[in-house]
Amino acid sequence: MINTPRVSIQVQSVYVESQSCPDQRRFVFAYTITIRNLGRERVQLINRYWLITNSDSHQTEVQGEGVVGEQPIIQPGTEYRYTSGAILETPLGTMEGHYEMIDHNGEPFRVAIPVFRLAIPTLIN
């Protein structure tokens, strides 16, 4: 877990075997992110940035507004949770990135998203 003075990020990822097709180099992963507002004032998630790296060292950058179609406002002491997905051409990879957020005064700040692994279960001992 990574903490800033105001926000913490927790990530869990799973392999989605039912949507994957290893013979066609299609490995589907879902990840759930929990964003907790540890501060005393509301914050809002404005943009996201991801760096996705597969085990062939191929990197893809993804950026855009909000997450899953929302730019959530997170009140003090509460959390926002969402699930999204990534498709890799290899059975192993990583994701990392950051959220661009604003505080209650409209001041921007960045929250790092820790590196997390995307891996089919048989690869992890």
UniProtKB/Swiss-Prot annotation:
PROSITE patterns to which the protein is assigned, alphabetical: APAG
InterPro entries assigned: ApaG_domain (IPR007474), ApaG_sf (IPR036767), Uncharacterised_ApaG (IPR023065)
Name of one Pfam family that matches: DUF525
GO biological process: error-free translesion synthesis
Superkingdom in the source lineage: Bacteria
Domain ApaG: 1-125
Matches recorded under Gene3D superfamilies: ApaG domain
Family annotation (NCBIfam families): PRK05461.1
PANTHER family, sorted: F-BOX ONLY PROTEIN 3, POLYMERASE DELTA-INTERACTING PROTEIN 2
HAMAP family: ApaG (MF_00791)
Name of this chain's protein: Protein ApaG
Protein source organism: Photorhabdus laumondii subsp. laumondii (strain DSM 15139 / CIP 105565 / TT01)
